[in-house]
Amino acid sequence: PASLQALAKRTAAALKAQGRTSISLGYDASLFSGPTFSPYWKKTWRGYEARVSALEINSGKLSRYRADPKPPRTAAKAFASRLKKAGITVTSITSTKAATSATEIAQVTSASLALIVKRTLLISDNVGAETISRHAALANGKPGSFAGAAATVTAWLNVHGLWRTGQQIQDGSGLSPTNRLTADALAAAMRLALADSTYRAVVAGLPVAAETGTLADRFDDKPERAGRHTVHAKTGTLRGVAGLAGYLTTRDGAVLVFAELANSSQSVSYERLYNWLDRSAAVTARCGCH
Protein backbone atom coordinates (compact mmCIF):
# COMPACT_ATOMS: atom_id res chain seq x y z
CA PRO A 1 0.00 0.00 0.00
CA ALA A 2 1.01 3.62 -0.52
CA SER A 3 2.88 5.21 2.37
CA LEU A 4 5.41 7.92 3.06
CA GLN A 5 7.90 5.20 4.01
CA ALA A 6 7.42 3.37 0.69
CA LEU A 7 7.85 6.62 -1.24
CA ALA A 8 11.02 7.45 0.70
CA LYS A 9 12.51 4.01 0.02
CA ARG A 10 11.79 4.27 -3.71
CA THR A 11 13.13 7.81 -3.84
CA ALA A 12 16.29 6.81 -1.99
CA ALA A 13 16.84 3.87 -4.34
CA ALA A 14 16.46 6.12 -7.40
CA LEU A 15 18.86 8.72 -5.96
CA LYS A 16 21.47 6.11 -5.08
CA ALA A 17 21.19 4.73 -8.61
CA GLN A 18 22.22 8.22 -9.76
CA GLY A 19 25.12 8.21 -7.31
CA ARG A 20 23.50 10.78 -5.00
CA THR A 21 23.28 10.46 -1.21
CA SER A 22 22.76 14.12 -0.25
CA ILE A 23 19.99 16.46 -1.44
CA SER A 24 18.08 19.64 -0.67
CA LEU A 25 14.34 18.94 -0.37
CA GLY A 26 11.67 21.24 -1.74
CA TYR A 27 7.95 20.72 -1.15
CA ASP A 28 5.06 22.00 -3.26
CA ALA A 29 1.57 22.37 -1.78
CA SER A 30 0.24 24.72 -4.46
CA LEU A 31 -2.37 22.35 -5.93
CA PHE A 32 -4.95 23.86 -3.57
CA SER A 33 -5.48 27.61 -3.29
CA GLY A 34 -7.08 30.14 -0.95
CA PRO A 35 -7.26 29.91 2.85
CA THR A 36 -6.53 26.60 4.57
CA PHE A 37 -9.03 27.40 7.33
CA SER A 38 -12.48 28.46 6.18
CA PRO A 39 -13.62 32.00 7.01
CA TYR A 40 -17.01 30.40 7.66
CA TRP A 41 -15.66 28.15 10.41
CA LYS A 42 -15.61 29.31 14.01
CA LYS A 43 -12.31 30.89 15.06
CA THR A 44 -12.40 28.90 18.30
CA TRP A 45 -11.91 25.74 16.22
CA ARG A 46 -8.44 26.77 15.02
CA GLY A 47 -6.67 24.87 17.77
CA TYR A 48 -8.09 21.46 16.89
CA GLU A 49 -9.72 21.59 13.43
CA ALA A 50 -7.16 20.67 10.78
CA ARG A 51 -6.12 23.02 7.98
CA VAL A 52 -6.91 21.81 4.48
CA SER A 53 -3.76 21.38 2.41
CA ALA A 54 -2.72 19.52 -0.74
CA LEU A 55 0.29 18.24 1.20
CA GLU A 56 -0.22 16.84 4.69
CA ILE A 57 0.00 13.69 6.79
CA ASN A 58 -2.20 12.30 9.57
CA SER A 59 -5.16 14.35 8.32
CA GLY A 60 -3.38 17.55 9.31
CA LYS A 61 -3.35 16.67 13.00
CA LEU A 62 -0.49 16.57 15.53
CA SER A 63 -2.77 14.65 17.87
CA ARG A 64 -6.48 13.88 18.03
CA TYR A 65 -7.43 17.32 19.37
CA ARG A 66 -4.49 19.38 18.14
CA ALA A 67 -4.32 20.78 14.62
CA ASP A 68 -1.04 21.12 12.75
CA PRO A 69 -0.55 24.84 11.94
CA LYS A 70 1.82 24.01 9.04
CA PRO A 71 0.78 20.69 7.46
CA PRO A 72 3.00 20.92 4.32
CA ARG A 73 6.22 21.51 6.26
CA THR A 74 5.36 18.76 8.75
CA ALA A 75 4.84 16.35 5.85
CA ALA A 76 8.13 17.40 4.25
CA LYS A 77 10.04 16.95 7.53
CA ALA A 78 8.52 13.50 7.99
CA PHE A 79 9.57 12.58 4.45
CA ALA A 80 13.09 13.88 5.10
CA SER A 81 13.28 11.75 8.24
CA ARG A 82 12.37 8.64 6.27
CA LEU A 83 14.88 9.52 3.56
CA LYS A 84 17.57 9.72 6.23
CA LYS A 85 16.68 6.23 7.46
CA ALA A 86 16.99 5.06 3.84
CA GLY A 87 20.50 6.51 3.58
CA ILE A 88 19.85 9.94 2.06
CA THR A 89 21.02 13.13 3.80
CA VAL A 90 18.67 16.12 3.49
CA THR A 91 20.63 19.35 3.83
CA SER A 92 17.66 21.75 3.69
CA ILE A 93 13.86 21.80 3.47
CA THR A 94 12.12 24.66 1.65
CA SER A 95 8.72 25.50 0.23
CA THR A 96 8.86 25.83 -3.55
CA LYS A 97 6.93 25.39 -6.79
CA ALA A 98 7.83 22.29 -8.75
CA ALA A 99 9.19 23.08 -12.21
CA THR A 100 7.15 21.74 -15.12
CA SER A 101 10.40 20.30 -16.46
CA ALA A 102 11.08 18.32 -13.27
CA THR A 103 11.72 14.60 -13.72
CA GLU A 104 9.76 12.11 -11.63
CA ILE A 105 12.03 9.56 -9.99
CA ALA A 106 9.60 7.74 -7.68
CA GLN A 107 5.89 7.42 -7.00
CA VAL A 108 3.33 5.50 -4.97
CA THR A 109 -0.33 5.00 -5.80
CA SER A 110 -3.05 5.75 -3.27
CA ALA A 111 -6.04 3.60 -2.45
CA SER A 112 -8.89 3.87 -4.94
CA LEU A 113 -11.24 6.84 -4.75
CA ALA A 114 -14.00 4.42 -3.77
CA LEU A 115 -12.03 3.29 -0.70
CA ILE A 116 -11.13 6.87 0.20
CA VAL A 117 -14.79 7.92 0.00
CA LYS A 118 -15.82 4.92 2.09
CA ARG A 119 -13.30 5.72 4.83
CA THR A 120 -14.22 9.41 4.80
CA LEU A 121 -17.90 8.63 5.33
CA LEU A 122 -17.32 5.83 7.82
CA ILE A 123 -15.34 7.92 10.32
CA SER A 124 -16.77 11.32 9.30
CA ASP A 125 -13.37 12.66 8.23
CA ASN A 126 -13.78 16.40 7.66
CA VAL A 127 -10.36 16.86 6.07
CA GLY A 128 -11.01 13.90 3.80
CA ALA A 129 -14.29 15.44 2.66
CA GLU A 130 -12.65 18.82 2.04
CA THR A 131 -9.84 17.18 0.07
CA ILE A 132 -12.23 15.16 -2.11
CA SER A 133 -14.36 18.24 -2.81
CA ARG A 134 -11.27 20.24 -3.85
CA HIS A 135 -10.21 17.55 -6.29
CA ALA A 136 -13.76 17.52 -7.65
CA ALA A 137 -13.51 21.30 -8.10
CA LEU A 138 -10.20 21.00 -9.96
CA ALA A 139 -11.63 18.26 -12.18
CA ASN A 140 -14.48 20.60 -13.10
CA GLY A 141 -12.25 23.55 -13.96
CA LYS A 142 -12.71 25.41 -10.68
CA PRO A 143 -10.10 26.43 -8.10
CA GLY A 144 -9.08 23.89 -5.48
CA SER A 145 -10.35 26.11 -2.68
CA PHE A 146 -13.24 26.43 -0.25
CA ALA A 147 -15.05 28.63 -2.77
CA GLY A 148 -14.28 26.29 -5.67
CA ALA A 149 -15.44 23.25 -3.72
CA ALA A 150 -18.65 24.97 -2.59
CA ALA A 151 -19.39 26.06 -6.16
CA THR A 152 -18.83 22.51 -7.41
CA VAL A 153 -21.17 20.98 -4.84
CA THR A 154 -23.78 23.65 -5.55
CA ALA A 155 -23.55 22.98 -9.29
CA TRP A 156 -23.94 19.23 -8.74
CA LEU A 157 -27.04 19.77 -6.63
CA ASN A 158 -28.52 22.00 -9.34
CA VAL A 159 -27.73 19.55 -12.16
CA HIS A 160 -29.49 16.74 -10.32
CA GLY A 161 -32.52 18.78 -9.31
CA LEU A 162 -31.56 18.85 -5.65
CA TRP A 163 -31.31 22.59 -5.15
CA ARG A 164 -33.95 24.08 -2.88
CA THR A 165 -34.73 27.71 -2.13
CA GLY A 166 -32.71 28.89 0.86
CA GLN A 167 -29.98 26.27 0.58
CA GLN A 168 -26.37 27.40 0.97
CA ILE A 169 -23.06 25.54 0.67
CA GLN A 170 -19.89 27.07 2.18
CA ASP A 171 -17.50 24.10 2.30
CA GLY A 172 -17.11 20.45 1.40
CA SER A 173 -17.42 18.92 4.86
CA GLY A 174 -20.50 20.57 6.35
CA LEU A 175 -18.52 22.18 9.18
CA SER A 176 -19.69 25.71 8.50
CA PRO A 177 -22.63 26.74 10.72
CA THR A 178 -23.89 28.81 7.77
CA ASN A 179 -24.41 25.78 5.52
CA ARG A 180 -28.07 25.23 4.72
CA LEU A 181 -29.50 22.02 3.26
CA THR A 182 -33.01 20.61 3.51
CA ALA A 183 -33.94 17.12 4.67
CA ASP A 184 -35.81 16.73 1.40
CA ALA A 185 -32.64 17.39 -0.62
CA LEU A 186 -30.63 14.97 1.53
CA ALA A 187 -33.22 12.23 1.08
CA ALA A 188 -33.38 12.87 -2.67
CA ALA A 189 -29.57 12.67 -2.89
CA MET A 190 -29.68 9.34 -1.07
CA ARG A 191 -32.34 8.08 -3.48
CA LEU A 192 -30.08 9.05 -6.38
CA ALA A 193 -27.09 7.27 -4.80
CA LEU A 194 -29.08 4.06 -4.43
CA ALA A 195 -30.35 4.20 -8.00
CA ASP A 196 -27.12 5.14 -9.79
CA SER A 197 -24.11 2.80 -9.63
CA THR A 198 -21.83 5.82 -10.06
CA TYR A 199 -22.35 6.47 -6.36
CA ARG A 200 -21.85 2.88 -5.19
CA ALA A 201 -18.94 3.95 -2.97
CA VAL A 202 -21.19 6.42 -1.14
CA VAL A 203 -23.74 3.73 -0.35
CA ALA A 204 -21.01 1.26 0.69
CA GLY A 205 -19.37 3.85 2.94
CA LEU A 206 -22.38 4.65 5.08
CA PRO A 207 -21.97 3.59 8.72
CA VAL A 208 -24.23 0.73 9.83
CA ALA A 209 -26.24 1.06 13.04
CA ALA A 210 -24.64 -0.77 15.99
CA GLU A 211 -21.87 -2.07 13.72
CA THR A 212 -19.49 0.36 12.03
CA GLY A 213 -18.06 3.86 12.00
CA THR A 214 -19.86 6.70 13.72
CA LEU A 215 -22.93 4.49 14.26
CA ALA A 216 -21.04 1.68 16.01
CA ASP A 217 -22.16 2.85 19.47
CA ARG A 218 -25.58 4.14 18.44
CA PHE A 219 -28.99 2.45 18.47
CA ASP A 220 -28.07 0.91 21.83
CA ASP A 221 -31.30 1.44 23.78
CA LYS A 222 -34.33 -0.86 23.58
CA PRO A 223 -36.57 1.63 21.67
CA GLU A 224 -33.83 1.92 19.02
CA ARG A 225 -33.01 -1.74 18.51
CA ALA A 226 -35.25 -2.23 15.49
CA GLY A 227 -32.77 -0.07 13.59
CA ARG A 228 -29.70 -2.13 14.53
CA HIS A 229 -27.88 -3.64 11.53
CA THR A 230 -30.51 -2.31 9.10
CA VAL A 231 -30.03 1.47 9.22
CA HIS A 232 -27.20 2.68 6.95
CA ALA A 233 -26.67 6.40 7.44
CA LYS A 234 -24.28 9.33 7.62
CA THR A 235 -24.17 11.18 10.91
CA GLY A 236 -23.64 14.90 11.37
CA THR A 237 -23.13 16.97 14.50
CA LEU A 238 -22.38 20.61 15.28
CA ARG A 239 -23.25 22.52 18.40
CA GLY A 240 -27.03 22.76 18.41
CA VAL A 241 -27.44 20.72 15.24
CA ALA A 242 -27.55 17.00 14.53
CA GLY A 243 -28.59 14.95 11.55
CA LEU A 244 -28.92 11.43 10.24
CA ALA A 245 -29.48 10.60 6.57
CA GLY A 246 -29.36 7.34 4.66
CA TYR A 247 -31.50 4.32 3.99
CA LEU A 248 -32.98 1.37 5.87
CA THR A 249 -34.81 -1.87 5.23
CA THR A 250 -38.16 -2.28 6.98
CA ARG A 251 -39.26 -5.52 8.62
CA ASP A 252 -41.30 -6.42 5.53
CA GLY A 253 -38.40 -5.80 3.15
CA ALA A 254 -39.06 -2.29 1.86
CA VAL A 255 -35.97 -0.15 1.26
CA LEU A 256 -36.62 3.45 2.32
CA VAL A 257 -34.47 6.57 2.23
CA PHE A 258 -34.72 9.04 5.08
CA ALA A 259 -33.19 12.26 6.38
CA GLU A 260 -33.62 13.75 9.84
CA LEU A 261 -32.36 17.14 11.01
CA ALA A 262 -32.57 18.62 14.50
CA ASN A 263 -31.94 22.36 14.86
CA SER A 264 -31.85 24.94 17.68
CA SER A 265 -31.14 22.30 20.26
CA GLN A 266 -28.23 23.75 22.24
CA SER A 267 -30.04 23.16 25.53
CA VAL A 268 -30.45 19.45 24.72
CA SER A 269 -27.61 16.98 25.30
CA TYR A 270 -26.08 15.19 22.34
CA GLU A 271 -27.19 11.88 23.85
CA ARG A 272 -30.83 12.97 23.84
CA LEU A 273 -30.50 14.31 20.30
CA TYR A 274 -28.99 11.06 19.08
CA ASN A 275 -31.68 9.05 20.87
CA TRP A 276 -34.39 11.08 19.14
CA LEU A 277 -32.83 10.58 15.72
CA ASP A 278 -32.13 6.89 16.29
CA ARG A 279 -35.59 6.14 17.65
CA SER A 280 -37.23 7.91 14.76
CA ALA A 281 -35.28 5.75 12.29
CA ALA A 282 -36.00 2.63 14.35
CA VAL A 283 -39.75 3.30 14.30
CA THR A 284 -39.57 3.53 10.51
CA ALA A 285 -37.61 0.26 10.35
CA ARG A 286 -40.38 -1.48 12.31
CA CYS A 287 -43.11 -0.40 9.93
CA GLY A 288 -44.91 -2.59 7.40
CA CYS A 289 -44.56 -0.26 4.45
CA HIS A 290 -45.44 -2.43 1.46
Segments (PLM) and residue ranges:
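A small/polar active-site loop signature that marks catalytic segments
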Residues: 51, 57-200
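Periplasmic/cell-envelope proteins involved in peptidoglycan metabolism and beta-lactam response
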Residues: 1-54, 58
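Short, glycine/proline-biased beta-turn/loop segments that scaffold the active-site neighborhood
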Residues: 29-41, 88-101, 210-212
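Small-residue-rich helix-loop
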Residues: 137-290
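Short, hydrophobic/amphipathic alpha-helical packing segments
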Residues: 4-12, 73-76, 277, 281
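Solvent-exposed coil/turn segments that connect beta secondary-structure elements
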Residues: 28-32, 42, 58-62, 137, ...
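Structural alpha-beta junctions
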Residues: 17-21, 81-91, 286-289
